[in-house]
């Protein structure tokens, strides 16, 4: 970090540890920049800052409209001159890191981080920014925390809020991002950066199926195990924007923060605005090293303590088995059949509340439909089998045909006079209004208090574009997206604190809100509504670059493309369960599933929950997919290969990674014992014939 002679904050270098840094050497680009000169109004003369190039120098918190045409960190409206030009005021260093009251944050209960807190100010307006850079050395991670303070004497409007701004004195990067859609989320995409600005964004009010608030910049020749990689993740569940700008002199600026398409936030005099946190993780041993750091910081410092290492019970969800067509007798039949299939947790999905027999009514009416189900009897009998019990909710949504919106039409975040668009026949509730959040909390608190519920699936089945907040005037409508996200966090915080032993799973039509903000409150997220195992290979592969398998909901359904063995073995590398009617399973199919379920129960805690993942063959290879996971103590491992093309006569060895080279391991394929060194240098012999979409799961355990 450098305080330039101008008072501007610079970050000349970000990367592997270096003992000595020469900022002047790094900043020098040769030649002369017209924007190094400035007019000093105090004496009416032209002056020059040495070694300052406004369009090229590596700024820590780039100003707005201050001769730097690259993307800025912040922008305002409401002043006679909206230029922002921040200069250094003070700094301090302390152990630990800051927290938020209303936003998720990276936890540091053990004070492992060291924080550099810097105050900068626009002296012409008296706007201050407190920048906190918290370093977790063991994760190679820097957490950016920003507070924007208005001391101008009048209200201003914040129009841009970028939580991460990082400059690099180079332009030879590939960018890796993860576009997708419903049923095909987070697909791996690698592109070469070129001059101009590359944008990855969501403007739909949530982090979205289409893009994820996570990108990587990497050496052009970076692989899983080699090359420099810079990963940036945004801890936010609303709309986001990431811009990667390659400038005219070969420098790169990456910014990530709140999308400004529907964002303009009033900050009154004396008040502040907290930017959501952003993370930058560095690795110089390829994508694998960055993923391992991200997986560890999520498990240890983001997922809450009550759930970070809790065993994920084998789950059966009722949705694909019976949809909303059930009564008490049918549910009890399914529970008994689920038990015989090795299930440890039964989740009753949509249809248990209000008058909900179809998706056109009753969202918002969170009381049990006693004419349809005897929920107490169901819960008690489920527990009597030794299984846990869970329910589905969608707190942020409503139907016009509901008691809630008949009594309070203003709770809907729409203007009915404009013929608002519906999605799944529903509208978004106005979670920018505390009264609405309180109302939903009260009704859900009653249900969770009245029944012995172990698990809650929290869904979110539409985007927010067609919005109108009745509690906000026209001038403040563009505050809705952010206020609505804060309302989501407020309800999640209240419910998880009120019911600390209830396991919450996040969901948004599958993976439409898969982000660090959600993981702060919920220890797992439903990865995708797509359960086809071949499609899931691509989805879970892409997701794994940023998120550990322990937070990925991964289930088996009854699609006809592959057998249950392949489905179950793919789902094993996540929070495992079933989406089917267990009454329809044959004895042979139950036996096939039970074989994989037993592996899950034996290996999940040490290997999948807490272990390290190694991506061996990408599904984009087109021929096969392979991964292995290894426990932290290196004593257990799982290996999975899925064939994508029929190969009957091919010599094929897959080299594992992450084992202890000196330990001996017995494998479950042929019961032979080899050293970790052998498995990693020679590999597992996968030369036997496999048809397309057939899989091979092999366990490895230490032998002495």
Where are the regions that the model predicts?
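Polysaccharide-binding surfaces and accessory modules of carbohydrate-active proteins
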Residues: 5-245, 261, 664, 668-670
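Short Pro-Gly-centered flexible turn/kink motifs
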Residues: 88, 265-284, 693-700
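Carbohydrate-binding surface patches
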Residues: 215, 224, 618-660
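C-terminal beta-sandwich/jelly-roll accessory domains of carbohydrate-active enzymes
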Residues: 645-704
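Glycine-rich, aromatic-flanked loop segments that form ligand/cofactor-binding clefts
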Residues: 39, 49, 53-97, 222-238, ...
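Conserved, mostly hydrophobic/aromatic
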Residues: 146, 270, 382, 504, ...
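Glycan-recognition surfaces
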Residues: 399, 403-438, 482-584
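Aromatic-lined carbohydrate-binding/catalytic grooves of carbohydrate-active enzymes
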Residues: 307-442, 455
């Amino acid at each position: 970090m450098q305080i330039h002679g101008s008072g501007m904050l610079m970050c000349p270098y970000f990367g592997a540890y270096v003992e000595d840094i020469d900022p002047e050497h790094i900043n020098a680009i040769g030649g002369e920049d017209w924007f190094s000169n400035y007019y000093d109004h105090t004496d009416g003369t032209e002056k020059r800052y040495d070694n300052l190039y406004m369009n090229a120098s590596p700024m820590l918190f780039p100003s707005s409209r201050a001769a730097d045409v690259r993307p800025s960190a912040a922008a305002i409206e409401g002043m006679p001159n909206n230029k922002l030009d921040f200069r250094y005021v003070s700094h301090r260093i302390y152990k630990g890191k800051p927290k938020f009251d209303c936003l998720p944050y990276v936890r540091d209960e053990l004070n492992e981080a060291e924080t550099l807190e810097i105050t900068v100010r626009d002296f012409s307006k008296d706007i201050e920014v407190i920048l906190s850079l918290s370093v977790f050395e063991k994760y190679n991670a820097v957490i950016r925390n920003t507070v924007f303070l208005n001391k101008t004497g009048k209200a201003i409007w914040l129009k841009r809020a970028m939580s991460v701004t990082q400059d690099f004195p180079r332009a030879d990067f590939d960018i890796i991002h993860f576009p997708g859609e419903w049923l095909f989320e987070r697909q791996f995409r690698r592109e070469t950066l070129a001059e101009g600005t590359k944008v990855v964004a969501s403007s739909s009010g949530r982090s979205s199926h289409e893009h994820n608030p996570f990108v990587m910049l990497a050496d052009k020749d970076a692989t899983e195990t080699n090359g420099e990689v810079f990963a940036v993740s945004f801890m936010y569940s609303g709309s986001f924007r990431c811009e990667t700008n390659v400038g005219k002199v070969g420098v790169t600026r990456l910014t990530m923060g709140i999308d400004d398409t529907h964002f303009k936030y009033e900050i009154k005099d004396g008040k502040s605005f907290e930017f959501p946190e952003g993370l930058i993780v560095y690795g110089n041993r390829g994508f694998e090293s960055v993923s391992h750091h991200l997986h560890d910081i999520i498990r240890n410092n983001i997922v809450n303590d009550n759930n970070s290492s809790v065993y994920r019970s084998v789950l059966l969800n009722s949705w694909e088995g019976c949809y909303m067509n059930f009564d008490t007798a049918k549910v009890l039949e399914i529970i008994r059949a689920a038990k015989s299939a090795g299930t440890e947790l039964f989740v009753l999905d949509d249809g248990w509340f209000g008058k909900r027999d179809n998706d056109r009514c009753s969202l918002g009416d969170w009381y049990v439909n006693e004419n349809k189900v005897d929920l107490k009897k169901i819960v008690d009998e489920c527990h009597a089998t030794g299984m846990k019990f869970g329910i589905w909710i969608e707190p942020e949504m409503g139907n016009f045909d509901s008691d809630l919106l008949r009594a309070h039409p203003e709770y809907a975040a729409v203007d009915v006079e404009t013929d608002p668009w519906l999605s799944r026949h529903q509208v978004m509730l106005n979670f920018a209004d505390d009264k609405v959040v309180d109302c939903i909390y009260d009704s859900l608190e009653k249900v969770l208090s009245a029944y012995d519920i172990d698990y809650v699936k929290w869904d979110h089945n539409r985007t927010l574009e067609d919005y109108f907040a009745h509690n906000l005037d026209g001038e403040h409508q563009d505050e809705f997206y952010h206020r609505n996200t804060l309302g989501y966090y407020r309800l999640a915080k209240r419910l998880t604190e009120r019911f600390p032993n209830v396991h919450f799973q996040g969901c948004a039509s599958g993976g439409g809100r898969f982000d660090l903000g959600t993981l702060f409150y919920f220890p797992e997220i439903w990865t995708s509504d797509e359960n086809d195992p071949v499609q899931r290979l691509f989805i879970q592969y892409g997701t794994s670059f940023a998120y550990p398998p322990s937070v990925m909901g991964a289930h088996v359904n009854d699609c006809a493309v592959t057998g249950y063995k392949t489905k179950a073995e793919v789902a094993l590398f996540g929070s495992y369960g079933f989406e089917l009617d267990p009454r329809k399973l044959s004895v042979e199919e139950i036996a096939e599933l039970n074989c994989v379920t037993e592996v899950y129960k034996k290996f999940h805690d040490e290997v999948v929950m807490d272990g390290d993942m190694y991506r061996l063959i990408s599904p984009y290879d087109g021929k096969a997919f392979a991964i292995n996971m290894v426990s932290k103590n290196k004593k257990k491992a799982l290996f999975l290969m899925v064939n994508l093309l029929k190969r009957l006569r091919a010599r094929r060895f897959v080299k594992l990674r992450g084992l202890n080279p000196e330990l001996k391991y017995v494998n479950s394929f042929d019961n032979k014992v080899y050293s970790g060194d052998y498995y990693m240098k020679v590999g597992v012999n996968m030369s036997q014939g496999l048809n397309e979409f057939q899989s091979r799961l092999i366990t490895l355990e230490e032998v002495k």
